[in-house]
Structure formats: structure tokens, C-alpha cells
Amino acid sequence: MTDAGKKERVSILCVGSPSITTLLGWRLQQSSVVTCQETIMFFNAPEPSTNVFTIQSKKFGTRKYRPTYRLSKLEEVTSDSEPFDYVFVSIKPNSRNFQLSNILEPVITAKHTCIVYNSTGAIGVEEALQRQYPENPIFSLITHTPVSQRSVDEFFFGDCAPFYLAPAGSNLEIDQLSRLVEILEGGEISSEILDTLLPLEIEDLALPLSLYPLTVLTQNPNLPKLLERPDINDLHQGILQELDSLCNCLGSSLDVKKLSKQRETLLSHMQVNPAFREYRSNRPVEIVQYLHYCIDLATKQSLQVPRLRTISALISSIQHLPLVQPHHMNDMHGPTDNSPKKNKVLVNMRPINPSSFVSDRHSPLHPYSVPENGKPNMGRIPSAPSLSKGRAMTADNMDMLSLTTRRSRRSLYSPSLMQMQQSLKSDYEGLGRTFDPRFAPRGSPPVRGGKNVLSPEAKEHTHKNISPESSRFGTPSDPNSSSQSLGNEVLSRPNSNSNSAESRNGETDDSGESETYFTLMNNNKGVEPRASVASETSSMTVIPNAMRRFPLARGTSRMKS
């Protein structure tokens, strides 16, 4: 408290993952010791559309949190703005994409800003910050509070675990560290100061250091199945013993109960571990730098760690090689195995076997060579499957299918299509008798050029018992009628315009189109067009009955095909 009775004002920046950043900003704002002007920034995360966050916790219940300030990027901090007193950093380093020390440069004020790095799940990151900012105090922070983000603006916190803080390296700024602990405890966060956090960091990384590199070296991301091998399990236990010896040199030891609980959680985690995922995506494996740091610590303590050195050398030599499909990807069990398989062809394809790139000693052919008998088939369209062969349009069913629409053609099932093919498969000489015996077969030749008339037998049939159903489909009721007579001039062909019938009177005999038309309708390539006029009449009389047998349009009474 100041002399005027007012609280001290402290400017704090929290940058990192949304969950831990929101937790820190929320509790610092509620501190009863100082007036905290906190600024939060979500690093490498989607920008929320609102400035109010919903926070649920077991200790404090459901609360609304509105940060004092927000930044979308660190470059928004101007040089004339008030410097930050504390900067909480919860960012994992990524040497391939960015340097952590360079990112923090706009918000760090030399000899003033205190850097607090959240080293939960990491080790040795503070050394790079010490080299970049030698004049600023740097502290390490570890917390095991379970945090989760349910949506962009909704967070959940479990039991509030204590915060462990310690000076990084040779920093002895105990006064600023004690002041920071008071601010955190004013926000009801229990905090504790330790001499070093290295034993806790090694304990958190013991299982990842002893398991993740083995999944990369064996090309098997399935941890439970990997530990079933006796040699791999012995190697895993040997690495844990070396890490325990390193903790003993630092004045601590690994907690066996905590390790067993972590092992159960890790082995039940069905997703691929981050080290194997980074290796598969051709990115630097993060666990390698942690291995190097543990080896350096062992060297300073004059401790022999042969297994750690061997694993570190092997994984460092293969992480920059070209990627090879793993041998045991099918052994990995994960949530993706239970997801629906959209493309069965692609799902069933096995990954490329590395041995397929080497010529097979049992086969004289190259793996990618094509035999001579298969070269003529290269580039051809594969034949239709057995189910689609029955639906293909052939010369037998082209006459009827050419009169149908695409929708009705799609609704023709194979039994109906087979029935149609059987009806139309006979010679076109008896086509009229197949559907309706009332009409005569092909009759007399035309009387006049370009004019079609019916034989007396056909006229007699047309006068007898014309059903209203046939007249509904356009069957003429009067052969002498001027508008619908089969023997008159206005007799129109299927799918043609009847208004242009007179214009075709003199062109029917000589045009190539009519010859092609007669050939298609009558399947009678040897018959002249003039001699096939009666066949056209016979075909015309078949169309209404065919349509009656296979209805094409929707109606009140629709026959089920």
C-alpha cells in the first residue's frame, strides 16, 4: 500500500495458450494486494469475437471475466506506452518457425521487466532467454492445475494446484520473486518458492523422454503394444533409472506413485504422441532438445547416462532424413479407427512398403515395369461391372429408351429392362403383332410419292374397338380425319414436329436423315427408305402400347415397374 492509502498499480502481460493465459489474467485481476492492469494475448490461437469470457471452476464457480486490455499481436505495444512489470510467457519454443526470445522483444524493457516462463512440460528453455536478456530477472513457473477450453470464450479449471516458482539459473532477484508470490496469493492462488525446478521438470518429462523417442526409432506409435516387447521394456526401464540418478544428483528423486499414474494416463491416451507426429510431418522433434539438456546436466554432474546418449544420437540422425512410411501404422489404435470410412478404396490401401522401392529378387521384372501383354490395355477405360451391363443402352433397347426421359430411364430396373428387351428383340417384321394384334403387318407400298396410306386390313382394324386409353395416347379414331389419320399427309414421326410434315413431303425420299431414321426404327438396313414407309406406320402404332406398358409420366394411377 502507498502512503495515500491506495493500492500499488502493477502492469502485467500474459501471453501464451488461451487456457492458462485466461487463468492467470483472471486471478491477477482479482488480486487484493495490488491494482493489476493485466493485458492478455492468445498466441497462435483464433481471436475470440467477444471481450467477455465465461470461466467455470470448482473453487470459484461460474464467473465472467473481462480483461483490462487485450492484444492481437505483440507489435501493437508502442514504445511510449507504460512498460510491463511482469510478463508471463506460456509458449513452447519452436526453433523452426520462430525464436521465443525475438518474439518477446517488443514487450521487454531492459533492467525493468521480470520474465516469468511457464516451464510445465519443458526443460532448459530459460537459458535462451537468459542469453537474450541478461539484464532482466527470469523466473520459472510450474503448475499442474487442470485447464481446458470448451469453446472460444468458455474455459474450465479443475482443482487449483499450487504454483511453484524458482529463479532460473544464477538469478538471485528474490525480492521481485517474493512480490510476485504475494500478488498471486492475493488472487487466491497458492504459491511456493523453490531453489530450483529442475527435479520437477525432469519428473514431468520422465515418461516422455523414455517412451517417445522409442516410438520414432521403432516406427511404432502404439505405446501399449510397443512395451509388450521385452527388449523395449528393458530399455524404457533403464532410461528411467538414469533419470532418477540425475534427480538424485540434484537433491531429489522420482516419485514412483506419480510415475505410475502418469503411465496409466499416457498409455490410455489413444492419439499419436507429439514426437512421432512431428517426425512424420518432417518437423524438428521437440523431445530431442530436452534429451540434449538432460545429457548436459548429467555431464556437469559427472554422471554416466549411456542409454540417453545412444537414444539422443540415433533420433538426431534420423529426424532430418526423408520420411518413410512406418511398418506398423496398422497397429496404431485411435479414434480415427472408429470413424466412418467414406472411401473404402482409399481406406483399404496399405501404405507403401519401403522394400517395394528395391527390385524384387524373386521377380525378374522391375516393380514398376509393365508386361508386354498389358501394354495394349494401358489407358483404356475399364469395362462396366456386371450390374451396369444390364442397364447399358444397346441396339435392342435403343428404340424405346430413346423415347424416354432421363428420369424415367433412371427408374427402369433390370427386370423391366429385360422385359422390354425380350419384347423388342424379335424381328421388326412382327413388331406390330407383338404389342397389338389389331394392326396389320407391313402392308402395301405407298400409293403416291411421299404419302403414306394404310392397307384395307389396317383401316378395318382402326375402325374396330378403339379404346379411349389408346386415343388418350394419340391413337387416331378416324382414318379419314384430316388431323389424326394415319393415312393422311400430316402423319408425324415420333419426337418430331407435326407442323413441318408438309415440308417433308418432297424431301423424305432423298434426304439422308430419313434413311438413317428408317434404319434406326426398323433395324432394316437393307430396305430402301421408300419401301419402309409402311414399317414406319407399323412402328408408330406400337408406340402407344409400349408407353402403356412402360409409363413415362407421373399420373394418378402409376404402374409399378
UniProtKB/Swiss-Prot annotation:
Entry-linked PANTHER family: PROBABLE 2-DEHYDROPANTOATE 2-REDUCTASE (PTHR21708), PROTEIN PAM1-RELATED (PTHR21708:SF25)
Keywords: Phosphoprotein
InterPro entries xref list: 6-PGluconate_DH-like_C_sf, 6PGD_dom2, KPA_reductase, KPR-Related, KPR_N
Biased composition (Polar residues): 465-503
Organism for this UniProt entry: Schizosaccharomyces pombe (strain 972 / ATCC 24843) (Fission yeast)
Any one GO CC term of the record: cell division site
Annotated region described as Disordered, given as residue ranges: 369-390, 429-515
Full protein name: Uncharacterized protein C24B11.07c
Modification Phosphoserine occurs at: 383
Keyword Acyltransferase carried by entry: no
